[in-house]
A protein has these predicted regions:
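Carbohydrate-interacting regions of secretory-pathway proteins
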Residues: 2-285
């Protein structure tokens, strides 16, 4: 038998057969908090004798742990992913794997392939870093979205995309990285080489969404003004002349919802994810 523990994940191999792979290690004493980062190894025997032999251990390098800066801590930010524990997340925890202090995405497109915060957020500032490890990566950040739906329409999707890749040469402007998908196009940003970490901030205050990448504001717009208040077609049809993608976005004006990592394929990793909740802004109607 072999037991491997990395961050908050455990893999068990019994007689050459993997019986558990990258399963979240829960805190048996209190499931509301993550498992401890370190501790003793305990052998537990039930009602039958337990015989163990040839037991040995190899310690692995510690996973980097992210902590808030003094400024962010004083400003009210909260860590959503510290590099080791995903206890603040739910959904597809199988294809979003902690690797060397990052969340590595292996999920494919679809509601069941998404990872969500357990908590819902309304107005907030979300900060994180991301890196593409291959060309043509497509992903997204869902905001104010329910779980298990297409966030681009039933909430909002802030596009995450390697739009410089040749396969996206015919990309529509509202699909560029940082866009509020189908609603407000973002300014096109030039990414550094693959593997380089990018810094992003998403600010959602009422109807105003602001996206900053590597210190540059690439989107600052009002979602209600962008569609003239018509997030769905006035005639009840499927074609909406007021949105740039001409589709209905019934969840566009959600007051709150989950934040989601929207897997459209492998090849992206996230780290240093933190958030600051803001007082609810007054929305013009």
């Amino acid at each position: 038998m072999q037991v491997k523990v990395v961050s908050d994940r455990v893999t068990v191999v019994l007689n050459g057969v993997t019986t558990a792979e990258n399963v979240i290690l829960e805190n048996a004493c209190n499931r509301e908090i993550p498992a401890y980062a370190e501790g003793q190894i305990l052998l537990i025997a039930g009602n039958a004798p337990l015989n163990v032999r040839e037991m040995y251990i190899r310690e692995l390098p510690a996973t980097p742990r992210f902590e808030l800066s003094e400024e962010e801590a004083a400003d009210g930010f909260e860590v959503l992913f510290d590099g080791t524990s995903m206890h603040k997340w739910t959904g597809n925890t199988t294809n979003y794997v902690p690797v060397d202090g990052t969340i590595y995405v292996m999920a494919q497109y679809g509601g069941s392939g998404n990872l969500y915060t357990k908590k819902e957020y309304g107005d907030f500032v979300l900060r994180f870093e991301f890196a593409f490890d291959r060309e043509g990566v497509n992903n997204g950040i869902g905001i104010r979205t329910p779980m298990g739906v297409d966030a681009a329409y039933h909430g909002m999707e802030i596009q995450v995309l390697d739009h410089d890749a040749p396969i996206y040469k015919n990309l529509r402007v509202y699909q560029q990285h940082g866009s509020v998908y189908g609603i407000i196009p973002a300014k096109r940003v030039k990414f550094p080489p693959l593997g380089t970490w990018n810094v992003e901030e998403i600010r959602a205050v009422g109807d105003r969404i602001t996206v900053t990448v590597n210190g540059e504001v690439i989107l600052d717009g009002d979602i209600r003004q962008a569609c003239q208040g018509h997030n769905v077609a006035p005639d009840g049809g499927k074609n909406n002349p007021y949105t740039v993608d001409h589709k209905n976005h019934p969840g566009l004006f959600n007051a709150s919802g989950h934040i989601g990592l929207l897997g459209h394929g492998a090849g992206i990793k996230f780290r240093n994810i933190r958030i600051k909740e803001l007082p609810a802004a007054k929305t013009k109607k």
